[in-house]
Each structure stands twice: as C-alpha cells, then as structure tokens.
Design a protein with these regions (language model features):
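C-terminal membrane-associated helical module and adjoining short loops/tails
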Residues: 1-11, 137-292
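Multi-pass membrane catalytic core of lipid/isoprenoid biosynthesis enzymes
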Residues: 20-27, 69-127
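Hydrophobic, membrane-inserted alpha-helices
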Residues: 32-35, 91-94, 212-220
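Helix-coil boundary and interhelical linker segments in multi-pass alpha-helical membrane proteins
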Residues: 36-51, 87, 91-111, 154-177, ...
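Alpha-helical transmembrane segments and their membrane-interface exit regions
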Residues: 57-62, 116-123, 187, 235-246
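C-terminal ends of transmembrane helices
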Residues: 65-74, 121-137, 142, 190-199
Length: 292
C-alpha cells in the first residue's frame, strides 16, 4: 500500500518537458553524425564521411524548426547548437579534405584546413552576437557554415560521377581546385555577403509556394541523384551571393548631399562650383544680414 502511494506521488514527465528537450536531441544527433564523419574520414571512407555531414546538416535544420514551432528555443540550445556546428561543419569537413587530399600535399598543407576551421568559428561567433535579442530576417550575413561544410562534404561523391570524370578529371586540378574552394568558402563565411535563408513552406502565399517548390526540388534531387545534384547546387548558392552583391554594388550611386540649401560639389563632377568654405560662408551670411 505504501509503495503504491509513493509511486503515485512521483512526478510524471509531461509533454511540455518532452517538447523542450526535442531541439537539443536533434542537436546531439547532429554532433553524432559529425563525430562519425571524422572517424570515417580517418579510416579512409570518404564517401560516407561526406554523407554523415549532410545528415548532420539535415538535423541542424530540423532542430531550429522544431524550436521555433514549439516555442522552446533557449539560450542554452543556441550555444549548444553553435558548439556542435563548429565540429560538424568546421572540424569534420576540414579533416575530410585533409585526409582526402591535403595529407599528401606537403608539410604545411594542413594550415589551410586550420584556416577553414577558424573561419567557421568566427562565423558562428558573429552569428551569435548579431542574432542575440533581434528578430530573424530572411538573409544571412556571410555564407552559413552548414552550407559551406556540406558543400565540401558532397565534393567527393560528385568527383566519382561519370560526368565529372568525363569533363573535369582530365584537367588534373583536384588539389588546386580544393585549395581555391576552401579559401573562397572561408572568406565568404566571414564576409558581409548576404545569402538567403530557405523560404517557409506554405500554400497560401507566393513565398510559401516558392518555399514548398524549393524544398521539393532539393528533396527530389537529393534522393534520386545526390552525387550529381548537391555539389552543383552548392556552387549555385555560393555564386548567387557573390553575383547579387556585385550587381547591387554596381547599381549603387552616391546621392547628392545638401548642406544649408547648397549642393556640395562632387569631385567627379567638374560642372559644379566648389563649396564655400566655412569662413567664406560666415562672411557671406553676415553681409546678407546687414541692413540696406
């Protein structure tokens, strides 16, 4: 009788507690695949090492979605997510590239992999600072580290395709291409280049339909032709941010500046007279104020 009463007094886990830990469970799953990728790369299984990073990226996307939909996002979860992302999308891709190509490229080739990890760490630290207490926008500042990490992860499966062997393998530029790719990704992650977030899924608005279409295309390509589809998709995403920033920079024009009703002369416009100095403007103003 007493044992039954004690059992009845024990608190039972509520659904609220289960929902709260779900985002962290996805994050720890992300860490699991990131660590498994490192072990696989060390053992020379480069194909699965890359796919494990992709699986980590899927869980990284899901933990944020679950936290937002359930309203259970916490500061602890945000910090845990950043630490896990550093391993899954920083250390794991860098070691994959090292064991795949850079281990035989010279004594100090590992430094490039280290630079990539540093860029991921800086990218995540800046993201935490910029997003603290601010509403989410539709753009990332700098290329997201999961996108960069997964792009490196799917390079090896892409390099084993017949299309790659028929069109690019004869150039024998794998090492040089990986050097350029890793440096470019490192620079883009710490840059101010804007990259779009995935649009939300829906059927009641144009943006929602666009998001649904994008997700379905990625799902279709990722299931039926992942080796051919994912790496070119990453290149397209990387190029989009660069092209967009370049075009917007070329379209920007300096606006005319007005000071006390007068247009300031532009150094590149010889038709405009030079602006009055402060002393000349003061004397001119004094003369205008004198009684006639």
């Amino acid at each position: 009788m007493e044992l039954r009463q004690r059992r009845e007094r024990l608190p039972r886990p509520s659904m609220r507690h289960v929902v709260v830990v779900m985002p962290s469970a996805f994050t720890l799953g992300n860490l699991f695949f990131g660590f498994w990728s490192i072990v696989s790369a060390f053992n020379g299984n480069f194909r699965w090492a890359g796919w494990f990073i992709v699986f980590a990226g899927i869980l990284d996307m899901l933990d944020g979605r679950v936290a937002r939909l359930s309203g259970t996002g916490t500061r602890f979860g945000e910090q845990l997510d950043s630490l896990v992302d550093l391993i899954s999308f920083g250390v794991a891709p860098a070691l994959l590239m090292y064991f795949l190509d850079f281990s035989n490229a010279g004594r100090f080739a590992w430094i490039l992999c280290y630079i990539y990890v540093v860029a991921v760490a800086l990218r995540l630290a800046r993201f935490n600072v910029l997003s603290a207490g601010k509403p989410s926008t539709g753009w990332f500042t700098g290329m997201p580290s999961p996108s960069a990490g997964m792009m490196l992860a799917v390079y090896y499966p892409f390099s084993q395709t017949n299309w790659y062997r028929a069109s690019l393998a004869y150039m024998d530029l794998q090492h040089e291409g990986l050097v350029v790719l890793m440096l470019l990704l490192a620079v883009l992650m710490v840059s101010n280049v804007k990259y779009p977030k995935f649009p939300p899924i829906g059927v009641r608005s144009a943006r929602g339909i666009l998001g649904l279409t994008v997700h379905l295309l990625i799902l279709f390509g990722g299931i039926f032709a992942p080796e051919y589809f994912l790496f070119p998709l990453g290149l397209l995403y990387m190029a989009f941010g660069l092209v967009r920033t370049t075009v917007l920079g070329l379209m920007e024009r300096p606006e005319p500046v007005t000071v006390i009703g007068e247009r300031v002369a532009d150094a590149h416009d010889p038709t405009l007279p030079p602006p009055l100095s402060h002393e000349r403007r003061r004397h001119s103003g004094d003369r205008r104020q004198e009684p006639e």
